[in-house]
Amino acid sequence: MDSAESELLEEEELPEIKYIDSAEFQNFDNNADQREIQFRWMEAFETKEPRWFRLLDEFITPLSGKRGYCSRIVEKYARVLLHQGFELSQTDGPLRVAAIAASRDVGQAGNLPSVLNNLSEVTRHLNLAQYASTSLATVGQRKFANEVVQKTVNQERLGCFHLFLIGYREGLENLLSNHRHLRNFRYSAKKRHDLLTEHIKNIFQERDSFIQAPEASSFALQTVLENWTFPLQNEQIVQLAHANTLQMRALHVKGDGFYFLNEALNVAIAFNWSSSQEEMEEFYSIFTPQATNPRGKRIFQFWKMISKYDRSNGNAQGFLVTAQRLEEESKSDDIGAGCVTAVELACKIRNQCDQHEDLSKTIMDTITRHPSLGPRMMQLAERCGVGYENEEIIHQICDRFSLHPSEPTWLDYVENLVQTVGRFGSVKETMQKSLKIMFEFLDFDSNRFNERAWSLFEKVLSLTDPSFVVPEWRTRFDWWPKYQRLRAKDGRKMSNMATKTRNDVLEALEELVL
């Protein structure tokens, strides 16, 4: 890159940062972290790689050092780079390896993030190095793993981490399962609680593998979930959780240790290990006297109640008090959008007790506090037999424009608007709003081949005065048609009829006089 081009890139204003994710971006306490990435492909074919990377790196750095990384965002970043056409050799910095991983469905191979993501919004925040490196291992790119680790993990932890990353899974498994203290610990797991506790304390007076690398506990959980040949199964998960819990207390992390315990409890719930769940529920007392992290403590209480309900085969009436408590606790500012798991259990209990009025109120209250959870709450309403509330839910979350613009829920909203033009405002306001929503929805690569969207867009255009279209089209006329007609790299296609509809819409737009 010559000096003139370099100067131009330095002076060039970065794209506006919007929309990281439909749920996570509301959870950040610091205003500086509440910026959002807007994945639209303006100038998609002319944008230079350094410009995009500067934008991504600006956001990556503070997050990876503060509160970890959101696993779904890693994949989105990778897809951004891949869509721009960048290869591995063209990128630079902590996400240089992400581009090659994007097209292979990173995170969908049954590892810890993808399995637990089905259980809770809470468990989606994982360590950047762990997730990125696991993704690399999944797609066979282990030779670059060391570079990722060096940027995100301190030197004391690097040795054990690197052992895993370069493919020596057996070595790490042996380190965890055959360590002399852990081996003795497994054999003595059924001893009285006080002797067991003393035994674990003795373990962590030495340089045990968990002390050297706290990530080892997460690796152990992953080996269980991915069905590797590994002895830590079923009740051994309890031993792992107990040892790690005591270690975290010894390191004076206090309430933060609840997050490690939550991971283990989630694994037990996912695999329906009832005895393991019951034992881990009692580990609460280890942290409670010193807990200073109210969010970690509250989340564990959520999962403890969920675990107890999961193990129970009794009448749901006996859990009505649990439902009430979950509804109250989910309103805490400490939890944010992570309250979704508590709300879902509360609604499940209400539904089994035929308390649909209270169920509907809980859903609507949740959406009022966290509009980004709207689509998930709509699915919950359908499952609990109160789907008739969905029209009100749609308008509540869409009227406030608090929903991610790529969400399919917008199509339901626009369809309702055009069916009742004038009901929710003047005709001009309704059509301008509908046009803006449809353009923004189709700006996203994931929506370009949505047949329903193009059919609905054609209907909106047929009802709209051309002058209403010009403001939105003016910012897109020079790149949008080419972008929409571009073949998808993953082979996505539409039917012939839908393709004709799309072409008719684009031709009508191209005929507009600006």
Curated annotation (Swiss-Prot):
Superkingdom: Eukaryota
Protein known as: Uncharacterized protein tag-51
Lineage: Eukaryota, Metazoa, Ecdysozoa, Nematoda, Chromadorea
